[in-house]
Design a protein with these regions (language model features):
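Short N-terminal segments immediately surrounding and downstream of signal-peptide cleavage
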Residues: 23-40
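Outer-membrane beta-barrel channel domains
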Residues: 30, 42-53, 58-60, 64-294
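Bacterial Sec-dependent N-terminal signal peptides
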Residues: 1-24
Length: 294
């Protein structure tokens, strides 16, 4: 509790000094992450891309980095590159000049009340306020060998992000999930009493199924031109690949305070987290806490 109060107080102390443009982050798995990794390889030593080991990426910095790369003399882009850059800008209009917004509008006027652009269900971009809201819907069914039961994932929810006065950013992600994972994951859940990537769960009516709620959110702001601060409850990732030995998103969400200092070719990150112990004992009691500083 004392650690949580310390993080909250530190975030509140830093907040009044926020006076620079801020940003929310690209979620893990977003297609723009692949674009960034590709352009990092193509640009080689360009310091704008020299930070791919610390995820998630800042949306504002990603858009600025891509624009910086495109403006370089002699740059060659494939049709796929151009398409992905256009999609990146369409998905992040709050960081695109207002004069360019019109070219991303939906061509069918009758759906513009909601899908004003093909990228987002509902979005508002006015002076001192941006808001983007989207549904989260996923339903998959599959089969696997040596298993008579279908595997499935049923996810419904909503995600929203925005910024206020170009100083404070916010993000939230809320979903309700029911799934029956492949057999090897079911074995992991049975042995560890934990669902990969999730926290508290309960058995679902289907044999081997699980039911869990996923709630994430954070605020972002800038202390100085070169220091970004994020405070909230979400996942963080340090390293490369789908998993990382240093810090992966395989576990549950956690309370965190993150300070990211980026200047010239240097990117220095401080991360403070409150974590929960793995615990398979049931009952009406608090789960043990542990803390990390990286």
């Amino acid at each position: 509790m004392q650690f949580k109060q310390t993080l909250s107080r530190l975030a509140l102390i830093l907040l009044p000094f926020s006076a620079f443009s801020q940003s929310t982050f690209l979620p893990q798995g977003d297609k723009a992450n692949i674009l960034m990794e590709r352009l990092e390889i193509k640009s080689r030593s360009d310091s704008f891309f020299n930070y791919s080991k610390t995820k998630p990426f800042s949306r504002r910095h990603v858009v600025n980095a891509v624009n910086h790369y495109v403006e370089q003399p002699g740059v060659k882009l494939s049709k796929v590159d151009k398409y992905n850059i256009e999609r990146l800008q369409m998905n992040n209009l709050e960081y695109v000049p207002v004069a360019e917004h019109s070219k991303y509008l939906s061509k069918k006027k009758f759906i513009r009340k909601f899908y004003s652009t093909p990228a987002n269900l509902f979005e508002v971009h006015v002076k001192d306020f941006d808001l983007v809201v989207n549904p989260v819907i996923q339903y998959t069914v599959a089969t696997e060998s040596n298993n008579n039961d279908n595997v499935f994932l049923n996810t419904r929810g909503v995600t929203a992000r925005g910024q206020i006065a170009n100083k404070i950013g916010f993000f939230t992600y809320l979903t309700d999930n029911q799934e029956r994972a492949p057999k090897y994951v079911q074995d992991f859940i049975s042995m560890r009493k934990a669902v990969p990537g999730a926290g508290y769960y309960k058995p679902f009516k289907a044999a081997g199924g699980t039911d869990y709620f996923d709630a994430r959110g954070y605020f972002t702001f800038n202390v100085t031109k070169y220091i970004d601060v994020a405070f909230g409850y979400d996942k963080n990732f340090i390293g490369n690949g789908h998993r990382s030995l240093l810090l992966s998103d395989f576990g549950n969400n956690s309370l965190f305070l993150k300070l990211n200092t980026r200047i010239w070719k240097f990117n220095y990150q401080n991360l403070f987290m409150e974590l929960q112990n793995a615990d398979d004992r049931i009952g009406d009691r608090l789960i043990g806490k542990k803390y990390a500083a990286m």
